[in-house]
UniProtKB/Swiss-Prot annotation:
UniProt feature, compositional bias: Polar residues: 18-32, 385-403, 408-465, 472-489, 519-547
Basic residues composition bias: residue spans: 1-16
Biased composition (Low complexity): 502-512
Name assigned to this protein: Tip elongation aberrant protein 1
Cited Pfam families: Kelch_4, Kelch_KLHDC2_KLHL20_DRC7
Amino acid sequence: MSFLFKRNKGSAHKPTKPNFSKTSTTPSTSQLKHSHESNVKMSTSTVTEHRKKPTGSGSHITASPWSKLTVRGSSNVLPRYSHASHLYAEGGQEIYIFGGVASDSQPKNDLWVLNLATSQFTSLRSLGETPSPRLGHASILIGNAFIVFGGLTNHDVADRQDNSLYLLNTSSLVWQKANASGARPSGRYGHTISCLGSKICLFGGRLLDYYFNDLVCFDLNNLNTSDSRWELASVVNDPPPARAGHVAFTFSDKLYIFGGTDGANFFNDLWCYHPKQSAWSKVETFGVAPNPRAGHAASVVEGILYVFGGRASDGTFLNDLYAFRLSSKHWYKLSDLPFTPSPRSSHTLSCSGLTLVLIGGKQGKGASDSNVYMLDTSRFRLGSVPTTSGRQRNTSFFSNSTGNTNPSAFNGLLTSSRIPSYNGSKVRSTSHPSRQQYIGSSNSRFNTRHQTISTPVSGRASNDLPSPVVPTRSNSSSILQPSYNLNSHSSDRRNTNDDDQSSLNSQQLSNQAKAQGEVSPTLSFVPSSHSMEQGNGSVASANNAQSEAATRSINSISEVSEVRFPEQSSVKTVDERKSLDGRITSVTLETLVEKYSELSKQQIVEWFKSKLYEILRDSASKIDSLTEKLKVANAEKNAALCEAALEKVPLAKHNKLSDGTFSTPDKENVQSTNDAHIMQENFSLHKALEVMRETSSDLDKQLKDATASQKELIVQTSSFQKELVEERERHNAISKRLQEIESLYRDRELLVTNLEDQLVDQTVTINKFAFERDQFRERSMGFENTIKDLTRKMEATDMLNVSLHESLRSVQTENSELVTEMALLKAELVKKQAIIDANANIYDKLTADHTNYETVSADINQNLKETLDKLLNGSSDFKNNEIELLHDQIRITNAKLEKREKLINASKYIEDTLRSEIQEAAEKVSNLEFSNFNLKEENSNMQLQLMKALEQRNTGAKQLVNLRMQLSTATSELDMLKLKLRTTALALEESPDDYSDILSILRADMSPFHDLHKQCGVLIDTLNGVKRGFGIFEKKFTDYHKFLENISDKLKSEEDTSLETPIHENQSIQSDQIKEVGEVLSAIKSLSDSVMLLKNQIDDLAKEKLPLSSSDDEKVNIKEKTDFMKLLVKSGLSNPPAKEPVHDNEN
């Protein structure tokens, strides 16, 4: 579906004229003179005939710019308010109407089109995404796109407002919802939509009690694209105050807004938005600006803004019309226009050429209007005309160039004052004839026929201005009784009884009208040519004419009464009509108060006075004419009587002659002819007298009828005055009642204000809750969407995760086993570390003991040397003592050795306790490690454990290095001992007699040899333990390496290789660690081999036999010494015997 966004920029300034309008050429607006006075002059040189009908139908060309358009099918559309339309008709012919509140007080979403060419409403059945029922929305027509946004769409406060943009293709009648990315303006109502270039601009509006003043734009060129979005206009200065119910329009590529309300204040300011500068500015205006209002309608025609209606701050509906010239920034008030529509708000005003079309609107309670009104803007000329002061009407508004008042203008003036008007078929003069003119007129004025009553102006709807029955100038009293029917509303009435009774002539009436500053309505009747011709005839023809006029007037009154009062249509006689006059008058007076309560009472009183003056004036003129006729008839009668008296004298003479007096023949003939002539004249005079008597009797009857009718009129005037007095009393009572009602209303208003304040507080809280609920809904919707996406993804990944979960379960089980094994290995490593630490302590103790042994051995050697010297030099008596001393020393050394063994046992006990504590700590660590079930964490823990094992291996390696250094020192010392032994053997071979030196060397060197032998044994034991631990560790690592290889082989067959890389990395790291452990084990093996080799060498040295070349005794002694040394060496490897050897006893 494609839209053609064609915007005729000239349509707002140079509109095309519709087909139904025929307008003559008018001067351009540039030729008009502007004025600072707020007045208007209407051009009478141009008359636009909106709906031209035949003259026989009763329609008339009116001077009012307002007119009604008779539309077919309007009952289905109107009354309606808060609907949406567009400012300019499509092609000058069609106006689209959407939504609003109809007569059933329910929001609608129906679509109608008004065709101005055919004057018909047509319902359009649309398809697609039709907007929901709404009111207070905004719309605009651009090309073939009818665009709708916003409106009050929710039926509940908690519901969410619709903030979508809807587009209707007027060619295909298909609705489409615009897809806009990003943020959207919030739903609202009472806003406006305008077009600036290719963008539609949204301004203002309200949402419950919050009013907006943001300007949001939507580019139609980006419709249905990825760039389709709403953009908030960044304004450089402060925008207008927030408002709703305003009007907006574009002119010269600028956006204007006028009026509106923010709930508390009503505005009448005009603001302009400059899109190039992106700034707002308040327009300074001149002239009389409209009152602050909201809910009004406006449209622009040829650079002039027309504003109509709305609702004021006090809640009253308005029907005033204002014009604003955008070039001069001047306001004009177009006041006192006839046929102005009733007050209303929430209506629409569309432009079709030079004509504005008013549709719908909300009115007061009980008021409804189903009419479509049209305003012809070509009738206005915004020029300089002097204004009138006081209550004087601006008659120049309806005057032509010559200054003569035409009937339509006069009719319009009456309509503007809401007094019913009367039009004759031909009107020659609007001035009232004076009483002297009536007296000086001929008898033909008395013979005028009853004129035809004109239909209402323009012939639109007779129910708006019904024509009252006009009384004729007949002699019949029934004809002189008028029946009144007003189409105006009742208002204030003044007490004008003194004025009514003081002046009855036309001069006084005109003076009163001039004093009051008003032009009184007039009735002007023109006599027909037939009645004019018969006015010059005889008295008999005049009587016939009067009788004919009377019968026609009676028939006309009966016809009108049959239309007005159907129940009285059977009454056709004059007597029956007389009986109905009171009923008609009572009915019409009762309807005055009911139907026309809005008109001022002063205007009703003035209207009654004018009608009463007209009736009295007509009756006075009739009475004057009758008196003149009576005077003429009496004069003719007197003349005839005189002539008859004079004729009686020759008649008497003729009678005397006939009695007996005779004359000559000639004289007799002459006299006979004279008598015959006289007799003929007498006969004619007699007939004339009879006619005069008849006429005088008729005149007497007419005079009596006239006097009776005058009396009846006086009675009627008195009754009218009584009714006026009663009406004033009613008015006073009603005014008192109104005051009481106003006081009650004020109290109620206070209560209502309090309730409104409470309602406002409640609505604020409800709005907060609704806002929070909307946020919660949005968040929940987002959460639901994310959950749906996650469920979809989870469903997609479940199939993949099944196999992974199975493999992970197997891996986890195996990994748990590995973790347990690693924990055991770690515990064993901790134990080995503790053993190594204990061995280090023992080694330190051994070094300390070694130093002590060296000192003790030095002392013992020194003592042995001294004793040997003594033995050699001394006698044998001292040998036993010496031997005993040696035995004592040996015992002391054995005791010391036992102490040291106890210390070693204590260290072993401490080592066992430490091992148990380490085992408990290891069990705690294993329990903590079993809580980790994630594969990555377990791998990381394994890596950390391997790193710790490596650190421990490094520390063990360092200790091994230290042991190697100690072993190297021990080997060097062993080499030194070998050298010493070799030197001693060589010395014995060279000088076998020098036993003392050899013995001293042996005594001096046996203790360090014993110590070294003992250290080597301890070192061999520790190395064997370490070798066994590293063997177990190597076995475990080889098993673990095989397990990892099996896992890698399993994972290679599967597609997902997400776990291969870390396993390969772990495998490579562990293989490197295993290699390093293997190297350590090989080093330990080599070290143990070297130690074993050293031990074997020591044993070989111990087993070697030294050559002896001395005597037998000395050889025996040397042998005993060597055996003793062997025993010492054996005591270093194992516990020495507690008892002394046998050879000691022998010695």
